[in-house]
A protein has these predicted regions:
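Extracytoplasmic metal-acquisition and chelation regions
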Residues: 18-287
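Secretory targeting and sorting signals
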Residues: 1-22
Length: 287
């Protein structure tokens, strides 16, 4: 029952790696301040914070686009050249943005989320799954667009509610054992009090697109064999070794690096807050 409901909910909340239509470019707002974000996740955060003051576009909105190896187009460079504010994840996640900004003859205000958050360079760069760090980034975005209305306060209030939901899971020890195929959601797992049973060598190999060794694969299978262990996999990544783990496993859900889209229409089904809330809901599902 868990698997069935989890997969249905994941298909609504998260991007499918096998969308049947071409994903639609992401943009929001119509204000005079032009914001360009590296991904639609950060674009959504910017839109929620800037409100009516800005128009926001994202360069990456398709699960087939890998931020680590993304090759920007001339159109992408023009978008950055015309931007008033540029938002990037940083931490080695979207280095293509550094090159685009460097080539801009009239540099925009740059918000580097990883740098703003103060995260150690050796830490996980997927900081949009850490609601505390996103709050700090939101303040930097608000300062960049000189936003003094209620948008920032409303966004931070929503983040506080998500944090409260995570704390509830942690105190109640609800989450339990989770095997995450990649470290993308590690911040969320920590905040929810989950027991991350993923062998480090496994997640590192998958993230670096290398084959997992037979010995590590055996460790992974043993970890998943423990009753109550949930398999969390990145739905934009395909791997025969991940498929082996998924085969026949009961507790399973997907997580993404981009905003949710309808697999049939390509339409967006939610914003950043919806995405994180959906992931938290899955972590707290009774198994």
């Amino acid at each position: 029952m868990f698997r069935k409901i989890a997969l249905v909910l994941a298909s609504v909340l998260l991007i499918s790696g096998c969308t049947s239509v071409e994903p639609k470019p992401w943009s929001a707002g119509s204000g005079p301040i032009k914001i360009v974000a590296s991904t639609d996740v950060w674009g959504s955060v910017a839109n929620l914070v800037a409100g009516d003051r800005a128009s926001v576009t994202a360069l990456i909105y398709n699960s087939s686009q890998d931020p680590h190896s993304f090759e920007p187009s001339v159109r992408d460079q023009l978008a950055v050249n015309n931007a008033d504010v540029v938002i990037m994840n940083g931490g080695g996640y979207d280095d293509f943005m550094t090159k685009l900004v460097a080539a801009d003859p009239t540099p925009a205000i740059v918000v580097n989320a990883f740098a703003v958050s103060g995260a150690d360079k050796s830490r996980n760069e997927h900081i949009w799954y850490d609601v505390d760090q996103v709050g700090a980034v939101a303040e930097a975005i608000a300062a960049a667009v000189k936003n003094t209305d209620s948008s920032l306060a409303s966004f931070k209030s929503s983040l506080a509610k998500l944090k409260e939901k995570l704390n509830t899971l942690k105190v109640a020890n609800t989450c339990g054992r989770v095997f995450a195929t990649e470290p993308v959601i590690d911040y969320l797992l920590d905040d929810a009090g989950c027991v991350n049973v993923t062998p480090l060598a496994f997640s590192k190999a998958i993230e670096e697109e290398r084959d997992v060794s037979p010995a590590v694969m055996e460790q992974a299978k043993n970890a998943l064999a423990v009753p109550g262990t949930v398999l969390a996999s990145n739905i934009s990544v395909t791997s025969s070794q991940i498929s082996q783990l998924e085969s026949g496993h009961v507790g399973e859900f997907g997580f993404g690096e981009l905003l949710p889209q309808d697999p049939d229409t390509g339409a967006y089904g939610g914003n950043y807050l919806d995405m994180i809330d959906g992931s938290i809901t899955m972590l707290g599902w009774k198994k």
